[in-house]
Amino acid sequence: MKERVENLLKELKERLGIEREVKIELKRFKRKLAPVSLTKRVIYINRELIPKLSDEELGYLIAHELLHLKHGIYHISEFEKELLELSGKDLYLSLYRKTWKGYNFPILQI
């Protein structure tokens, strides 16, 4: 499980042009999917989700958090544009139906 996540992280860092070190930790969360610490440069992935997600969906979560490290905490236009170019609308909607819907997150208007 950890190797799968690390491989995706490496690939996505290259695609997004992120050179600084980023760590991933797998943890169990009751209500979080994949929070990020901007100061520690650590992405925390909810370990309960990993078996339920395809590589593409897991990659989306990792890319989303990597873009927070690249652009900051807010979803500015560059953030959203880069994420959609990387993953596409269909992948976002698939992931939303599998995960975020149960967490009562609003769906983005894309």
Curated annotation (Swiss-Prot):
Keywords (A to Z) from UniProt: Plasmid
Top-level taxon of origin: Bacteria
CDD domains: M48_yhfN_like
Family: To M.jannaschii MJ0123 and MJ1213.
Name of the protein in its database record: Uncharacterized protein aq_aa15
